[in-house]
Every structure is written in C-alpha cells, then in structure tokens.
Amino acid sequence: MTNVFIYPNVEFIAGVDEVGRGPLVGAVVTAAVILDPHNPIEGLKDSKKLSEKKRLLLAEEIKQKALAWSLGRAEPAEIDKLNILHATMLAMQRAVENLKIQPHFVLVDGNRIPQLPMSAQAVIKGDSLVAEISAASILAKVARDQEMIELDRRYPEYAFAQHKGYPTKLHLERLAQFGVLPEYRRSFAPVKKLLSTLLSKNHEYVFKIQK
C-alpha cells in the first residue's frame, strides 16, 4: 500500500468490493471482509494486479485468517431489472448482511456506497489503499472467475474461461455465432442489439435451454 489510509476508530471494519460490472454474462459478485489486526496477511493488493495463482493462494489465506468474510451477488435478471449500478449496490448490501460479525464501519471501493445500517465510506482506489477492500476484491474476483470456469464447462463453445464474460472480440464472435444463453444480461448493449436484430428479421428465436 503506497499511501496511508486513516482508518475510523472502531473495532470491526469491513471492506467491500465488487467484480463483474462490465461482463455481458453472469452475476455481479461482491465480497465483504473483516480482517484480524492480530493476524495480518502479506501481499494484499488490488486483485487485478495479482496473478491468478497468487489470487487463489491469498483467497485461501483470507478465508482462514479473516474474522469474517462473505459473498454477495446480483443475478442477471436483477441486473436487467435494476440496472448494473443498483444491482451492484444490492449485491454489496447482501455481502455485508451475510457477515457473521456485524461491522461497526464499512469501507467501500469506489465513489458510491450502498444503503447500510451502519456508517460507511467510499474510498476511491480503495482496493489499492485499504487492506480490507483488497481482500474483498480478491475473494470476489476468485469467486466470479470460478463461476465463469464452470459456465465454460457447460458451454465450451463460448470460451468463457478465456474472456470471463467481458465483451472481447472473441466473445462477441461466439455470442453472434451461438446465441444468447439464459445467463446473459439482456439489457447490455451487445446482447440487446443481437436480440433486436433477430427479432427485426422475424427469426424464430428461443433462448437456449441449460444443458
């Protein structure tokens, strides 16, 4: 951590972060973590700056050493109904609610905070400044990546393990070739455009049934 973050003077502080706002498919996943100040974890940083191997190792260490940790999520149908921002806030609320210890204060990565029953603060670049947020970003990233690997096993033709659901050139090509799965976010532009094109051409289009 290059800069020094001034922590609030309370006992239990939770860090919260999200992964998966940008992908076209799957849930947005959040995590909340309360670290043990007497059992520090070395090497915590923004999950995007860590190798996959290091993330997996740190995720296990976080789960073992943290006083409490939990995951929250908002499904594609909720994202389509609420929009991605509000769905992310909902997933963050769920992560905090799922903690076995209720925090006295919550630090959230970014510039917005969800509605919570305790005090909270948004921290821009918090995943690089606050250990609790870094830990949350790692847990959320590992959890969502594992979900994409599982989706890849079910639908290998989409190459989800490679692009993790983000709108890469490969992903857009496979989406156009194989169609929209139930796990896709239909409100996201590339998916919405494909569905609209198919409907406008009067194609009979049925969502693929899960294998």
Swiss-Prot record:
Its EC number is 3.1.26.4. Its cofactor is Mn(2+); Mg(2+). It catalyses: Endonucleolytic cleavage to 5'-phosphomonoester. GO terms for cellular component: cytoplasm; ribonuclease H2 complex. One of its GO terms (molecular function) is RNA-DNA hybrid ribonuclease activity. The keyword Cytoplasm applies. Belongs to the RNase HII family. This is Ribonuclease HII. The gene is rnhB.
